[in-house]
Amino acid sequence: MSNKYAHRSGIVKIIFLSVGVLFVLRLSMLQLFDKEYKEKAKNQSLRNITQYPARGLMYDRNGKLLVYNEAVYDLMVIPRMVKDLDTAFFCRSVGITREDFEARMEKAYTYSPYSASIFMKQISKEDFGRWENVLYRFKGFYISKRTLRIYDRPIAAHVLGYVGEVNEHDLETNPYYKRGDYIGKSGLEASYEEELRGIKGKKIMQVDVHNREVGPYMHGQMDTMAQEGMNLYTTLDADLQEYAEKVMANKRGCIVAIEPSTGEVLALMSAPCYDPNLLVGRIRGENFKRLNSDIAKPLFNRALQAQYPPGSIFKVAQAMVALHLGVITPQTGFVCDKVIGCHNHPSARNVQEAIKMSCNPYFYYTYRRVIQQGKYKNIYKDSQYGLTVWHDYMTRFGFGYRMPIDLPGVKKGNIPDTAFYNKWYGRERWAFTTIYSNSIGQGEVEVVPLQMANLACIVANRGYFYTPHLVRYYGPDSIKNPEFYEKHETGIEREFFDIAARGMYDVVHGAGGTAHKADIPDIEVCGKTGTAENYGNDHSVFIAFAPKDKPQIAVAVYVENAQGGGGTWAAPIASLIIEKYIRGEVKRKDVEKYYTEINPCQKLPLTRRIKKPRRR
């Protein structure tokens, strides 16, 4: 019997020993190999804190600060570390309701129970100061410092852009970003996101049982410093930009001003505009909804995204192409026979007079010679050939494609080609008589205002342009984009552009010109008026450059739905921009007062109430 019980006792000992060995092995595995449990254990005593870099600043061309940063704080939470929380006291301390607390905690749990996420974002320095002395009582919560964008002057919202929280697409496509990070959403903030954002750092802090940080882990040897973003030095003239927005304050339209010799954008505004600080901080979402629902579309960048018929300003490019192709000469004249509608004026005896008087029949016949060059007996094939040649030269002027300016969302406009009309009418079913409206900048031709300002640059430079751009350089090494310094030639002779410049000078200063309201004493302004047809009231259009020789500025102005042509509204507004830039001040105070205060599109509502859809 004793042997029997001894045998059983041995078996029991073996079983207990085996269980003990398995327990030790499992414990060792948990300690040494199981990453999840190791990470959980580490988080009980260590806190990984992301160090957010300061975003790069922005300056105007004269060194004036446009965008800077202000310190704010995010309240972070690690859900599984929240223990013994007096929820009522916590909610009173941070100023939220119990329901809000539960919703935020549920969101944090969904993201990760073991990782930090934002519980409350963009806390002011004042609120942080009030919470600092009680925060240690809330285990699992801590403060993370970051910066908030501040726009020094309430200008250039469409250029500077705004910053917002990353979305799911950002998280999926770029591993740099984590939930709660911020990214440039529009304007230069978006175009230069990688340069502006900097590089995040990391700090590991030891935390005691009372949720107090007691010092850096391993004396900070595992920490990495955040690297601040690079500063942008823009081409904008802040004073000119502010003035342009002042002049267009009660209007719809846009202004683009460029330095012809460099392609640097001096001012770019879209009206109505808004204060970029509206899209900063915790009120951003509410303000965005309000701006987005405004019937006047203040978020829409008309300077880059509106596609208008150019109207008569397009005649300058038409004349240059026709002269280069040899289908007309500088002395070619056409009778103003009203074959296409025109205002009352004498017949143009040459190209210079045609530009000055903006004669529609003149450019009708000029365009016909470009399209029907007699290369083929078949009129349809001949028109296809002529349109192909015309289209090629128009693209050399920067029309019909997205100009590579350093802002997102640029539209390309439309310069119709043979494929366009073949699709619309069918092959060999169209000819010049189908498309003649293109001759005066109507029909199927569409341009964006940036392209029209660039046309003014081309004439100012007598045949070439540099890509319009908004950043001169960035970073401590003054990094420049080499593409912005490439000269783009039209391939058209300088002597023809001299004719265009003289004709545009006569538009403003000559007898019978259409833009006498753009005349500035002692400044030679060269301009071209236009009236862009529209379903409602037509748009008032004007392009110009000044001075005539050694130009300093080229400008395009669109005033939407204005009751009058280009010479009535857009031309005098352009003259104010030119005078402000060249002189530094506007001396024609009566002109300034009138065109700043006047509203040419009074019948248009600026806002509307969004109606709720009816239930069916």
Model-derived regions: residue spans:
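Periplasmic/cell-envelope proteins involved in peptidoglycan metabolism and beta-lactam response
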Residues: 1-285, 307, 329, 386-396, ...
